[in-house]
């Protein structure tokens, strides 16, 4: 019958979920307990994007829950695993990391990668991860980005990457050293 009327059937193809190296999941050890008794006990990390006239600049941060300071940050034009690893390495150079440091993240591909697993293990960092689709589990990392964008980024039109890097670096210095928490 279909041939007689030149009709074609629509065949839906099965969609495959591709699995690459992004396979590590960690328990939610932080469990929304956003207070720490001492520095370098609980850290939260995340990535956000900053819009510039040249394109997006990605900002990766690590925030200490003891005093809400930004322990380390890195920026890049790409949202990559390398950006996250470089941020952790910067934190390692700056702070004394003990085996008790808990680093909490969302379930982004950077944080489930083999490279992230290897680096956190080599530094003695205990990874913790938000539940899937639950941004409140990593609220204090998200909160910093909200503060940054409200107090700094949305007040100016960024002409390019260099200007964004400068403004963000100056703001983080202000945030850590002068802003009342």
PLM features per residue range, with description:
Residues 1-181:
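Charged DNA-binding/catalytic regions of mobile-element recombinases
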């Amino acid at each position: 019958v279909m041939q007689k009327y030149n009709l074609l059937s629509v065949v839906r193809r099965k969609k495959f979920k591709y699995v690459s190296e992004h396979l590590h999941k960690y328990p939610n050890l932080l469990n929304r307990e956003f207070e720490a008794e001492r520095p370098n006990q609980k850290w939260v990390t995340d990535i956000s994007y900053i819009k510039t006239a040249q394109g997006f600049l990605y900002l990766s941060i690590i925030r200490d829950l003891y005093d809400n300071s930004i322990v380390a940050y890195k920026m890049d034009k790409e949202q990559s695993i390398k950006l996250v690893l470089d941020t952790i390495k910067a934190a390692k150079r700056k702070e004394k990391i003990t085996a008790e440091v808990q680093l909490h993240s969302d379930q982004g591909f950077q944080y489930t990668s083999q490279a992230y697993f290897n680096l956190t293990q080599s530094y003695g960092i205990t990874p913790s991860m938000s539940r899937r689709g639950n941004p409140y589990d990593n609220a204090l990392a998200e909160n910093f980005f909200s503060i940054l964008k409200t107090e700094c980024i949305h007040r100016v039109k960024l002409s390019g990457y260099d200007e964004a890097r400068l403004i963000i670096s100056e703001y983080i210095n202000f945030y850590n050293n002068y802003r009342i928490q």
